[in-house]
């Protein structure tokens, strides 16, 4: 699983058209970086999936770490803006024996990366907190409820749909 770090912030600061540009930059980068036998897909929102056939977590660790560290950017009002990604991955049948469980394991690893500061890559390990996404949601809810008067100003521009 691949997720653009702070994607909501990109949409809120620059507009959804620029969020779409970031999605396109990432998807084109995936197509260039990974071999033709790799299945690439968009899971929804800013989340992408990669299915690497006939390999183990150990086999792909270095490649995924390298992909995570590639520079990615989009232009907004003539200026280059960098963005990063986080990657979580799991291995069939070591971590899960069904596709949906495998995706949950990769998602758990992905959200562990997010909690550790983002812009990283991690394989699923037994013992990772399965409820990590829920915990992250509660943390964000707690922050929003305890910051009275905090709000986001969003200004649409001509490139925003």
For every predicted segment, state its role.
Residues 2, 13, 28-39, 75-78, ...:
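Nucleotide second-messenger and two-component phosphorelay signaling modules
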Residues 51-60, 77-80, 85-102, 127-128, ...:
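Catalytic strand-loop-helix junctions within cyclic-nucleotide turnover domains
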Residues 138-159:
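Sensory modules in modular signal-transduction proteins
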Residues 42, 71-85, 114, 118:
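Catalytic core regions of nucleotide second-messenger enzymes
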Residues 1, 123, 153-155:
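Core hydrophobic beta-sheet residues of small sensory/regulatory alpha/beta domains
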Residues 5-35, 41-45, 49-53, 57-65, ...:
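Conserved long alpha-helical elements within nucleotide-processing catalytic cores of c-di-GMP signaling
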Residues 40, 86-94, 101-116, 122-134:
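Cyclic nucleotide signaling catalytic output domains
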Residues 29, 70-73, 139-143:
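Amphipathic alpha-helical regulatory segments at dimerization interfaces
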């Amino acid at each position: 699983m691949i997720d653009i770090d702070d994607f909501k912030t990109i949409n809120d600061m620059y507009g959804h058209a620029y969020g779409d540009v970031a999605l396109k930059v990432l998807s084109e980068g995936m197509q260039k970086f990974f071999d033709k036998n790799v299945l690439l897909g968009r899971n929804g929102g800013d989340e992408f999936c990669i299915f690497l056939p006939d390999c183990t977590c150990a086999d792909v660790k270095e490649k995924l770490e390298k992909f995570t560290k590639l520079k990615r950017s989009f232009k907004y009002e003539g200026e280059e803006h960098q963005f990063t990604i986080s990657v979580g991955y799991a291995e069939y049948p070591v971590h899960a024996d069904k596709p949906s469980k495998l995706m949950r394991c990769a998602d758990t690893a992905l959200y562990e990366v997010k909690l550790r500061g983002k812009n990283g890559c991690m394989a699923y390990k037994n013992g990772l907190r399965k409820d990590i996404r829920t915990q992250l949601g509660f943390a964000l809810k707690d922050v929003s409820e305890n910051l009275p008067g905090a709000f986001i100003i969003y200004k649409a521009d001509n490139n925003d749909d």
